[in-house]
Each structure stands twice: as C-alpha cells, then as structure tokens.
Amino acid sequence: MPRRREVEKRKILPDPKFQDRIVAKFVNNLMREGKKSTGERIIYGAFDQVEQKLKDDPLKIFKKALDNVKPVVEVKSRRVGGATYQVPVEVRQDRRTALAMRWLIDYSKARGEKTMQEKLAGEIIDAANNRGNAVKKREDTHKMAEANKAFAHYRW
C-alpha cells in the first residue's frame, strides 16, 4: 500500500462482441500467457453453445450464473493469542465478482468434457440452474462462515 496517494483502479474496456465490461473481465481472467484472442474465442464459443442449448440470450444466462456463484460471506484467518480463528467477513462487491469468475473458470477446467468451450458452457448452464461445482463452492463457503459465526466479534 503506497503512502502517497490512493491508487486508481484500472479501467477495463468493454469486450468487442457484447460491449460488456464483465465479459471483458472474464476474458482477462481466462487468458493464459497474454493470449487474449484465444480467451475470447473460448468464451464466445461457449456462449454460442449456451445459446444453442437453452435458446436464450447467452449474456443474460452468463450474468445469472455469475450471480448464483457470487459469495456473500467468506472466512478469513485471524490469530488471537496462540489460536487461529476462521472469522466470517462480508465480501466486497468487486471481490464477489472476482471470486465468482475464478470459481467458474477453475471448476470448468475440472469438468470432463473435451474442449474448454464445452466445459465452460456446461459450467455456465449448471451455475445458471443453481447446480454445479462452482455453486457448491459458494455453498461450502457460506456453510464455513455460518459454522464460525461465533467468532464474528473478532472482525477487524
């Protein structure tokens, strides 16, 4: 953290196809070794598959899936005396989105389909329908926070 001034957040330009900043952010998260065009190809291909399977606007389905994966609370480790407690804290809005994107990508990679487009499309459809591993991760995070609610007074 710099002492001089608050660092301004970098502006993300909207993606070329949907003119949406969240999709552009998702492309940036998916991108490996600076290959943005490959990331865009994967996402747009996945969106095409989602549109074919559900006959609905893929952007709307993607945003619904993202909302279903966003965590509200998480636990952070806090050391008090000799003990480490898992303290539940509310998640900031930008971190919610970042975690949801990361979980969607991670659990897409772990799926059994052949191509990344198919994996991502499958995970987006599952998340939009409130099932799948990314949604399970959010539920587990919420359960962990609920179980450690007794330590909420250690918040900082």
From Swiss-Prot:
**Homology family:** Belongs to the universal ribosomal protein uS7 family.
Q: Which GO terms describe its molecular function?
A: rRNA binding; structural constituent of ribosome; tRNA binding
What do the Gene Ontology cellular component annotations say? Answer: small ribosomal subunit
Function according to Swiss-Prot or TrEMBL = One of the primary rRNA binding proteins, it binds directly to 16S rRNA where it nucleates assembly of the head domain of the 30S subunit. Is located at the subunit interface close to the decoding center, probably blocks exit of the E-site tRNA.
Q: Which PANTHER family match?
A: RIBOSOMAL PROTEIN S7 (PTHR11205)
Q: Which domain of life is it from?
A: Bacteria
Q: What is this protein called?
A: Small ribosomal subunit protein uS7
Q: How does it assemble?
A: Part of the 30S ribosomal subunit. Contacts proteins S9 and S11.
Entries under PROSITE patterns matching the protein? RIBOSOMAL_S7
> Coiled-coil regions in this chain?
none
An example GO biological process term is: translation
Family matches, as NCBIfam families: rpsG_bact
Keywords of this entry:
Ribonucleoprotein, Ribosomal protein, RNA-binding, rRNA-binding, tRNA-binding
